[in-house]
Amino acid sequence: MKYNQYAYVETSPEKATEELLAINFLPENYSSLSFSELLAVLTGNVLAEATTRQAKDAKLAEFAVDDQTDLAAFLLDTPTAITASQFANVALQLLGYHPNYDYSLTDPLTCGKKHALPAFKDLTSKEELIFTFYRLLNTRSKNGQILLDVMAGKGYFTQFWGEGKFMFFNGKSLPVFDTSQVIREVVYVQSDLDTDGDGKGDLLPVTVFRPVESQDQLKVPALYTASPYFGGIIDNVKTNHNVDENLTDATTWTNPKYVAKPLVKSPAPSDQDVPATELATGQSSYGLNEYLLARGFASVFSGAIGNRHGDGIRITGSPEETISQKEVIEWLTGDRVAYTDRTRRFETKASWCSGNVGMTGRSYLGTLQIAIATTGVKGLKTVVSEAAISSWYDYYREHGLVVAPSECQGEDMDKLAEVCQSNLWDGGNFTAKKAYEAEQAELLAAQDRATGQYSDFWESRNYRHHTDGIKCSWISVHGLNDWNVKPKNVYKIWQKVKQLPVKSHLFLHQGPHYNMNNLVSIDFTDLMNLWFVHELLEVENGAYEQWPKVMIQDNLEADEWHAESDWASDLGQASLYLPTADGDLSTVENGTGQLTFTDLGGTEFKKAGISETDWEYQFISGEEKWAKASLRFESEEFLHPTTLVGRPKVRVRVAANKTVGQLSVALVDLGTRQRLTATPKIFARGNQPFGYRFGADSLQEFVPDKATKAKLITKAHMNLQNYQDMKQPSKLEAGQFVDLEFELQPTYYTLPAGAKLGLIIYSTDQGMTKRPLETEDYTVDLAGTALLLYRK
């Protein structure tokens, strides 16, 4: 598998020498050393676990130069050069590869090519040797990290602890901060919101992890993770809403309104600055933050309103949620008051903060980055938003239907608010408990699970309407197989952000609701180090030009990443597919006639006692038990690999034998073959140290799995009663044909030669839609039905 490397910044030999000297890797007297002496010293310096020169020299005999000679013996002959094969053997061992197991000592160059390592060459001068070691320190090792990070995990940079300054290597920040003395503290930011109705601004607990060096004169930037889960998670999955119920006439919709909570203006910060008096007991929940904390970036967490030890109530997705999370940044930049404790007597400032703030986090944590960025708050320089919701309607609803996130059937805005209302665990907070109970009733009514329609309530929770306020640079990360936060969320915000006068990037990986910072196939953590150094430390390191605007992981070969200028339907050419009465999906033949299927609701699924995931695979694979409740059409085999891009569109002319109905459409890759695992395989657990004795991550990647019959590419759902307007329902008569036109979730998917494309038209999606208790007949008029794809 290829260890692709995008974060290496091309560097001149002169600059490389300066950087090697600065980190004490290249000795000051290097010019007086012979080639063999320099080779011994530089190799030994990689071995950070050996703390004396004698210990380092003693370990050289552990490394083979070829299948007959160890490095110590090789150096006894005082060589003045080393061949590409000899150096490759030493380098591969330094990078963590095992000779005779991972590669052959007689052919190390093949191993280097296999893993996409920089090419090895004959070295005949000290200058070449020095620069080659510079490149080696910046090369990804077997554990996925660059060799310099492996050395850091062994203690190399402890020699710089206490110096109180940032150090850089190849444009990235180095772990020179004393992680054994990280300051861990809690402060209480006062909000302008009074969501619990006690007449006082809500106090928002904020947890700070920062380098001890920031206690003196050093100002450090902050990485802020807005995490509603930080105070704890209330497990309420057993009380999720019932989805085994019949559909409701959507014309009962009343357009529920958003109602703002009262404001209580907080006092302006005074000159008082008392050190924090509460120690943090919470732990960082995000590995990238820990990695960068060792490199000088403070890590800040807050769940804001409704979180443990604080005031207020959770109001999922609301403007109040955005305001409260934004107020933490206002404290970091000196524009908002915070106190040492809940008595509100002593103010404390983020005097350690440089005023430059970046944001990190996945899912809800990524969502709040979007929300805060739209406010244009001062000090927020960049966001790295992973698997983020850009419209809460698109998370819990779709085209007039209640549609759950994957594996979250029955969850909704009220239930998520309860999950995050961790101050309910503070037994004495009776004010919050009373306000929470009232808010739960309001959320239940306003979210309108009966009709699933768009409303003012949902409009207030659509961040895409406020993108003009974004002033910070932008990175979005999303899984193309994320059926929790469906890809429409990132696709639609990307169409807005890419047009703004800010630097923006997009990463699309093959995962579900997952992080990508520790994949074999891409050096994402190094890219983020480079990015945050540029954005928060204001170092010109070429980060803006270092990698393509859009990077997309291939679904056939996980170690292939596609560089694109954009992610949109117009990357491809439009192709029209027409379903026919004999089950074909044709590009030439118009379908005629009508086909009918009977939806069984959730009755058979309940009897089967299988998981929603198992149902989906059996369904798309065509098992008769489930396939009979659908219409299925297959294309001819593709003669050449074909990539589908952007958002497919469907037009379906359909009639139901009831006055309500829901229609689902899925595109499926058909053909028995190996496909990538649904989640990455862990190659080595805990093998990527964040710093010296400071936690670790695990190397992982998608790999070929056992052969399967089919794979879901994309799908979508629609309420038949929205045939006239996606935002307003209409009456539906039994037997009335209506024309539904809607887009499926966006994709970037390659069908290999020999594969077939399947179109499935059905109704109940057991994992996402409501599961009616009654059967319903759906008749599709093929003459009014078509699929529009965009193909590369």
From Swiss-Prot:
<dbReference type="GO" id="GO:0005737">
    <property type="term" value="C:cytoplasm"/>
</dbReference>
<keyword id="KW-0720">Serine protease</keyword>
<dbReference type="Pfam" id="PF02129">
    <property type="entry name" value="Peptidase_S15"/>
</dbReference>
<keyword id="KW-0378">Hydrolase</keyword>
<dbReference type="GO" id="GO:0008236">
    <property type="term" value="F:serine-type peptidase activity"/>
</dbReference>
<dbReference type="GO" id="GO:0006508">
    <property type="term" value="P:proteolysis"/>
</dbReference>
<feature type="active site" description="Charge relay system">
    <location>
        <position position="513"/>
    </location>
</feature>
<dbReference type="GO" id="GO:0008239">
    <property type="term" value="F:dipeptidyl-peptidase activity"/>
</dbReference>
<comment type="function">
    <text>Removes N-terminal dipeptides sequentially from polypeptides having unsubstituted N-termini provided that the penultimate residue is proline.</text>
</comment>
<dbReference type="InterPro" id="IPR036313">
    <property type="entry name" value="PepX_N_dom_sf"/>
</dbReference>
<feature type="active site" description="Charge relay system">
    <location>
        <position position="363"/>
    </location>
</feature>
<comment type="subunit">
    <text>Homodimer.</text>
</comment>
<keyword id="KW-0645">Protease</keyword>
<dbReference type="InterPro" id="IPR008979">
    <property type="entry name" value="Galactose-bd-like_sf"/>
</dbReference>
<dbReference type="Pfam" id="PF08530">
    <property type="entry name" value="PepX_C"/>
</dbReference>
<dbReference type="InterPro" id="IPR015251">
    <property type="entry name" value="PepX_N_dom"/>
</dbReference>
<protein>
    <recommendedName>
        <fullName>Xaa-Pro dipeptidyl-peptidase</fullName>
        <ecNumber>3.4.14.11</ecNumber>
    </recommendedName>
</protein>
<dbReference type="InterPro" id="IPR000383">
    <property type="entry name" value="Xaa-Pro-like_dom"/>
</dbReference>
<keyword id="KW-0031">Aminopeptidase</keyword>
<dbReference type="Pfam" id="PF09168">
    <property type="entry name" value="PepX_N"/>
</dbReference>
<keyword id="KW-0963">Cytoplasm</keyword>
<dbReference type="InterPro" id="IPR008252">
    <property type="entry name" value="Pept_S15_Xpro"/>
</dbReference>
<dbReference type="InterPro" id="IPR029058">
    <property type="entry name" value="AB_hydrolase_fold"/>
</dbReference>
<feature type="active site" description="Charge relay system">
    <location>
        <position position="482"/>
    </location>
</feature>
<dbReference type="GO" id="GO:0004177">
    <property type="term" value="F:aminopeptidase activity"/>
</dbReference>
<comment type="similarity">
    <text>Belongs to the peptidase S15 family.</text>
</comment>
<dbReference type="InterPro" id="IPR013736">
    <property type="entry name" value="Xaa-Pro_dipept_C"/>
</dbReference>
